[in-house]
Amino acid sequence: MGLMMTFTPTQKELFNKNIEALSNILLKESLKEIKSSKFELILGKDNLDINLKDTSDNTFLYENVIDELNSMLNTYNDKYLLYPVLYFYGFGNGILFKALLQNKNHQHIVVFEKDIEIIWVIFHILDFSSELQSARLMILNTNKPEIQDYNELCSSKPFFQFSRIYFLELMSHYYERFHEDVLELNKKLVQDFKDSILSHGNDPLDALQGIEQFVYNLPQMITHPSYKELLSKRKGISDTAIIVSTGPSLTKQLPLLKKYASKATIFCADSSYPILAKHNIKPDYVLSLERIPLTSEFFNNDFGEFDKDIVFVLKSYVHPHTTKYLQKNNRNFMLVSTYASFINYLKLDDFGYFNMGFSVANMNFLLAIHLKHKNIVLIGQDLAYAKDGLSHTKDYSNLDKHEGHFQRDKNKYTTQAYGDNGKVESSFVWTLFRHNFEQDVANAKKNYYITTYNCTEGGARIEGTIEKPFLWACENLLDKDLNKPFEKLEPLSLNKQNEFLLKAYYKVYQSIKHCRDFSNKFIKSYKKIKNSFVSLQNSQENEIFIQEIIQDIDKTKTQIDELYNTQKDLMQILGPLLTQFELNLARIYVLNPKTKEDAFNKSILWIKEHLEFMELVYGHIKAQENALIKNILPLEEKLKERKLDKWMERVRK
């Protein structure tokens, strides 16, 4: 039983003022519900001497309030003076936060608290309203973590930009009792920052491959049915989608899938397609998004009549072998685009856009949302190794490529099992896919009122899904035959195709020119800074000279930033480069120089980093120019074949 603490009317007013300023609605509600507390307020002679006694075990929040406050302040004003974001576990008496926020360098302090009675008491004693209102002080309750809260925190500014210097500080020894919660939270934040970094793109070469293959695939995309056509003819014609993945649990679900195939829309992964063909279960859609030639091999086959009425939906980045194999047997395919700056620059809006996630299962899930299904049923979505160490179902064609993976990953990525049956072994990639999936499932429920049923009956738990046997889903969700085959999808008229082919040619040709113009201008800025830097190292420590170089660097960075608005076609390859650079630069930014020599060395380091970055920018834009020149050829051939040469000439002039 908590202590009935008597607060004065002024203190109650203060509590309400703090509550009003809180932006975290769930926390606000929880704090309003508290009527008493196990904590006793202990006030010393000094204004800052505010302690709490936990009457359940007679322990104190602080052993010595003033000493601990001073020691923390000294550490933070020395080592972490320039940190834009600080993270604490435990609210304590809150005085440390008020003191630290006097420093304008600290833009935000994020506080995680498990025992919110502490906040309840302190909110009656001290005024945090302005810090809370401006969001410089942010409080999260670790008992009610919202998946979205953490994702948003870890992917937004400035938290994301400074994620490489993230660390979590315990407010006081009292909080060591929650060590499991602390470890869990820390693991979650580190993982969310990693996911965020990956979603920003961590590899410019990956982006380059995407651009190359997208440009190469343009003629195929424009001459086949569009995404707009798919939505206009197929949206809302079925309530339940079944998504078929290739996990070890798939085999046992195939007989039921065959029995109920006519009553649901079946989406399947490229890897499950040959398996369904073998069992003569016709999917409605087969999706593929990988850029590698190995994935194209799932289509290096001929299932004859079986393929009639299946629509193959490909991300417009796929390896050209994929379309080559599909064309060989006259299969119906379409290329669909995701949001990406080079793709958006071409403005071929009929052929996009939807976000496709990291894996083909995510892509299936997201397409099922856009086609307005009310229920989404997952099967074969293990995202974990089977007990015998198998990574996929036994019919999977690339099983040999995963040999030894179970041993490699053992005990590194364990996670909660489906049906709460203990733990299962997962992998780095599956963990990433699972987190991605959990975000999608939460989003589908919140924004589209879609229910996701995980009927895998094995593998890893996917938070947010309802776990049910596949038989239950079939009997309860699938009651009538759908009108299959669905309406046929048609390509655009020949005139419209020609218009888009020319438009695409014009845009790609312009982008080659953008690369050249940018490189020529950029190399001049680079040489100027490089020469100044060489002179600087030979001169005496010249502060004015350093400032001039840093100003030149800032101008050049502004030049790159402006591309976001003026030349989006260059940002797809520069985006990941810029992200990785900024994340690493944060480590130099927060160095706190104590002497003149320290300050000089910090500036030298800052300039060196930027020079290396500029060399990379130049190299990548050159690589894009060459890639476009090489991959525009299929587009040129298609235009010649359609006797549009003279228009091509006009574009080139």
Describe these PLM feature segments.
Residues 355, 364-442, 448-449, 455-472:
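Catalytic cores of enzyme domains
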Residues 2-241, 248-265, 274-278, 285, ...:
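N-terminal donor/sugar-recognition subdomains of glycan-related enzymes
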Residues 320-379, 383:
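Active-site/ligand-binding-proximal alpha/beta "capping" segment
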Residues 263-273, 278-325, 337-339, 346-347, ...:
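Catalytic or ion-translocation cores adjacent to nucleophile or general acid/base/metal-coordination motifs
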Residues 112-114, 142, 269, 289, ...:
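Generic beta-sheet signal
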Residues 244, 260-263, 267, 289, ...:
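Alpha-helix capping and helix-loop boundary segments enriched in small/acidic/polar residues
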Residues 245, 276, 378-380:
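Short, conserved catalytic/metal-binding motifs centered on acidic residues
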Residues 106, 283, 373-376:
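Proline-aspartate-enriched helix->loop->beta-strand connector
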